[in-house]
């Protein structure tokens, strides 16, 4: 670590302590060239998922955006807030476990639909209609037919 007083890279750690919650490590260091003591902190750097939108722009992954979309599709339906949060958490966990740090928005939409379909077919259809930009009644008929054929 570079000494803030003399700029030397020659130092030693004289004390190390972990924060109460275990997320930060505090280290007291001493410069071996000038004797100056200074403190450094180490924190875990979370991996950030980036979403590539349909128009080509990117934005940080936002679980709240998923929850808002599900909430709109599930208005007056038997889908609890807890279930909505669980869906968003499961999607984030899946993406991180798969190492997908850049993900297409369409993949996120597909994952939401897959999970919502298991909970409430009506909420699923509402979400699908907005997400897939249904243009007329035929789009709804096609989606309903798919649900019926799969016995859901």
From Swiss-Prot:
InterPro entries: ATP-cone_dom (IPR005144), NrdR-like_N (IPR055173), RNR_NrdR-like (IPR003796). One of its GO terms (biological process) is negative regulation of DNA-templated transcription. The keyword Ion transport does not apply. Its cofactor is Zn(2+). It holds the Pfam family ATP-cone. A zinc finger (unnamed) spans 3-34. Binds 1 zinc ion. Negatively regulates transcription of bacterial ribonucleotide reductase nrd genes and operons by binding to NrdR-boxes. This is Transcriptional repressor NrdR. It comes from Persephonella marina (strain DSM 14350 / EX-H1).
